[in-house]
Curated annotation (Swiss-Prot):
Species: Conus pulicarius
Molecular function GO terms recorded: acetylcholine receptor inhibitor activity; ion channel regulator activity; toxin activity
Name of the featured protein: Alpha-conotoxin-like Pu1.6
Record key words, sorted: Acetylcholine receptor inhibiting toxin, Disulfide bond, Ion channel impairing toxin, Neurotoxin, Postsynaptic neurotoxin, Secreted, Signal, Toxin
Disulfide bond annotation, renumbered to this chain: 44-50, 45-58
Amino acid sequence: MFTVFLLVVLVTTVVFSTSDHRPASNHENRRASKRISEMTWEECCTNPVCRQHYMHYC
């Protein structure tokens, strides 16, 4: 009986500790993606060869 009690305590601890982490929202993911793409295009725009191929982004 004590073993069953310990098993229940262990399972509830694992379930609650893994559910505490809040996943990033779509809004946060979209902002991060936009920042990464802006940084990538800034690097591209400083490179003459890349800028020539992707002028519509610069």
